[in-house]
Amino acid sequence: MKQKNYHSCTVGQIVAGNFDTTKVFSRYHIDFCCHGNTPFAEACRNRGIDPEAVAHELNELQENTVSNAPDFTGWPIDLLIDYVLKIHHRGIRAKGPQIEALLTKVTEAHSKNHPELLQVQALFRYSLLDLENHLSKEENVLFPYVYEMFQAKEEGLKVAKFHCGTILYPIEVMEDEHNHEGERFEKISSLTNGFTAPEDACASFRLVLQQLKQFEEALHEHIHLENNIIFPRALELEKKEAI
């Protein structure tokens, strides 16, 4: 199989082409969601990693793995938004409070020996509060207009201009909030040694760390889909509407 040249791509473009590549990027702590627009080689060098070594691993993954990941790049924008709403928005609202409740229980039991849990608990609580505000803005402001633009394009119609002139403004706000959440979960990961359970951890302690890791992984996919696929397509739709 022909080796791919990743040096002309951003990290986000590589992940958009094959979501399984996140396994490689995550292993090297290369941010593919919040900073997915970073050129591949630059992202590697920022982590002190040889781009050629990472490119070799990516090519090996492509050659030796049968991907079960959805080809999100082939989905229309309305389906992508449906997926984000039904999988990620619902997932945050369903799983977030459950994780918070278990984290509170674990913190009460283990914070004497593991005071870092108090910080983790506070960070996660504020994350859920900020995410709820973030999701509401997407659901009530940005996504309805993107749906409207997509439907108008399908039917050969025009839509009224966005109320604040361009969707670039809310998108920039969303991306800034994504960055903030990414940084917050980096702190949680650092405090928990990459969600690794200490030797004295009980079953609940181990479970909540596993759940926090899964929550972060889902958040990474969520942010990747929006920053690297949905938002650029929405801006392109708006540009075509203006012609």
Give the residues covered by each predicted segment.
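Small-residue-biased structural context
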Residues: 1-243
